[in-house]
């Protein structure tokens, strides 16, 4: 989140949160961005959409947070930037996950396909159609192989997490 805020600055923004889950990323950004900012959040899970909507209400942000059930390829609107924590675990690695992850997460929120980038690529294919302005970027949280794989196909900058692993990517259009 701090990477996005440092990059964006103190301007108002209308942004999208793709794969919003509980809404933590989009709502945290709304709390830090100036008044007048807004977020369109989407997720394929109706339970996630309901949870993120309740969280927005609890934080007093429901007037600037709009969540709906849609996939990354169905994102529409015009956004200053997009943030996403898509499913990024390669399918072959799902069996090795800890029980506390598997038992409490919707499997669709975890399985990123063969290389962990299926949903990220769907979003990146859609992004040029919905990004506006001069700073047309998508911010992604991925597994540590994701940024390097993305850089083969996209103009991409990677960033390290608190453990020093490359887990964040900004893809510019």
Predicted feature residues:
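C-terminal beta-strand of the catalytic ATP-binding
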Residues: 88, 172-173
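Conserved SAM/SAH cofactor-binding pocket of Class I
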Residues: 1-96
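Conserved Class I SAM-dependent methyltransferase catalytic core
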Residues: 114-171
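Helix-to-beta-strand junctions that scaffold the AdoMet/dcAdoMet cofactor pocket
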Residues: 34, 105, 131-134
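Acidic-residue sensor for enzyme active/binding pockets
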Residues: 46, 100, 105, 141-144
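Class I S-adenosylmethionine-dependent transferase superfamily signal
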Residues: 29, 101, 123-127
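Mobile active-site "lid"/loop adjacent to the S-adenosyl-L-methionine
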Residues: 88-119
